[in-house]
Structure formats: structure tokens, C-alpha cells
Amino acid sequence: MFDYFYGQSGEMFSYFRLPKILFRDIKFKDLSTDAKTLYGILLDRMGLSVKNGWLDEQGRVYIIFPVQEVMDALGCADNKATKLFRELEKFGLIERKRRGLGKPNLIY
């Protein structure tokens, strides 16, 4: 349970950033809150990919975030995690590139 915040104490936590456009633009009205949350997590991962120099041959930053990690992060089942990825793709927020051979997808 959290206590009250005093002074600068609210800054001791780390946060996921969610673009306001996901909540304000009519085209994202039907995007689920869970998908918006996942998008914030993916954006956070994008920063790590930049630091690690994860670029494809065209210089685009990608992330690797397997379904299992989504399940762990959001406390959901496999089918829900897969549905959230599809939802983000449908709204044009991510693109997944399949690599095959049991390797996780690259996410742009």
C-alpha cells in the first residue's frame, strides 16, 4: 500500500510513458487500454534498443519482446498477448517481422 507523497518523493518511481495522442485522437478511440499500455512498454524497450544499437540493414530501430514477456509484464495469457500485438498492428502502431526457426519477431 502506498503512503502519501511528500515533496519530490513522487519522482522515486520509474514510469512508462504513453503518448497522449492514443487517448485524444479519435482514430485510437477503439484501441483497448491494455494495447495502449503494451505500446508504452514497447516504447520503453525502444530506448534500450537504441542504446544497444539494434538497427536493421535500413537503419531502423527494432525491439525484441516475445509474447512470454508480454504475458509476464501484463499478467495475461498467451492468447491475450497475441491479440494485443495484432491490435497494435491493426492501428498501425507496430510492425512485426517474422524471423522463423523459433526466434522471436522483430518489432518496429
Regions found by a protein language model. Give the residues of each.
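An N-terminal low-complexity regulatory-tail signal and nearby short nucleic-acid-interaction modules
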Residues: 1-24
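Winged helix-turn-helix DNA-binding recognition segment
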Residues: 7, 33, 45-108
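Short amphipathic alpha-helical boundary/capping segments
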Residues: 25-31
